[in-house]
């Protein structure tokens, strides 16, 4: 069975309106599945059981609760909900029936991909009840433990392989790097940005192997829903993701790592998938290199020796690591004791007590899903151990080092005065002086193959993504520094007079500039030309290649002084704003999650027996509070963290920096 056939059966196992009427949810699930031409949804019950155990295994028997509130997954906050259950079910059912008409002639694969990506937004679009509409994305999967949505539950359910071989899954972690050094080795804002984007882009290239073999819902962290690169992937498959903004592709929102549930425990299959990921990344780098050299017409100039140096300098990038924790040991489910090498004895014993507690007092006996937090922690520890095994190939390079990284020898340079600055120590370096744009190499700069790839990667991106990356660049620091001056001065007649004289004397009808987004429509002159000290015969010759005389320079200065008198002088300083969210590792590991009581509906927590909660001081037996004081880490928690980061990066940061203020966003993700 293909992943998409599995997906459809598991996705429709629970209806999205389940919280409104739990006793009738199975009948509605079959009805909605039929709308979309899906049958056999009962086969998804084992995947559903594992996903449910991950999310809500610590409930006693016979606890029932109406849909009255929604809990925030990462805090103590809650929302009280008052909705008419019957009307809500009727409206959702009607919406699904109408929406399903556009899915009936699709292949199972396209149907699965579009249901995963578009169904939620299509329902929101068609729902008429405004109160119901706002709750659709966060309708809880269980009214008793309403801290995870039905959508997150269905995502996890569809990720779990529990058809032919019950619980046949592995938790998988993949990472590429180096991160800090690769991004920080920069001389321009564009270097910072492109270092971030390349790591994000290559991580997604690796993800494609999981997407194509297991489906997009198998990627647990980051959640690929509405991720720009995932939407672009769907576009390339001939599908239309709803409300997709191609401009968001420029935001590198995919981190340099991902966690996935892979539907196999076979070591050879896992190794094959991992090997294919590495091959995909290496092939993408090769394609990028070849396309860039071809576009810059460098490929025909390189000797065989230079090509060999280029290949050697790219061969160990990126560093790629992966680890997997199978959920089976031989033919049996993995047990808590099988993970004892990763934890202290106290931790193992505590989890054994918790498992026993859930087994004896819980609504259902726990299954392998109960151990997700242990699996994830063991996975991270395995990755830490793997990274300590540093693989390297000894390479000896004698010569002048790269201006950017200082690690590898210069292979490409621009030097207009003293070529021996590079050729004396690097006789095989390629002289690109006056042969490419100075945005890729400035005078006196020499780059290794990897840093040259980073500097010119936009050329490849323009070929891959089209106009999104056309003329991609960042404003100069002078443009940023004088932005508030330009905004204040642009409507003054003196501003127009200065611009007119500038173009008259230079005889240049138009200058290509990279302005701040907020000033883009009004910008005609680059910021540096609004600083009086930059108005010199030499500067015009060096920067624009034009000759102006001293009299014209004085006239321009007089015009500029008149403008200063009205608008003030432009500032010579700018700020770099660095905003970092601390403790991401602790959030992902569950260390900072709220107390266990905040997972439950507040009425349910009040109804739980004191001995179950651990509030009965007369009894020596441990309850929830003693055994698991904080919420258990689940895939839904990982999804919530990912969604918050994605929404912040895509919907808020750029708007705040570029639309509301005079700034330029370099990186957010």
Language-model features and meaning:
Residues 1-669:
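Regulatory/sensor and coupling segments of signal-transduction and defense proteins
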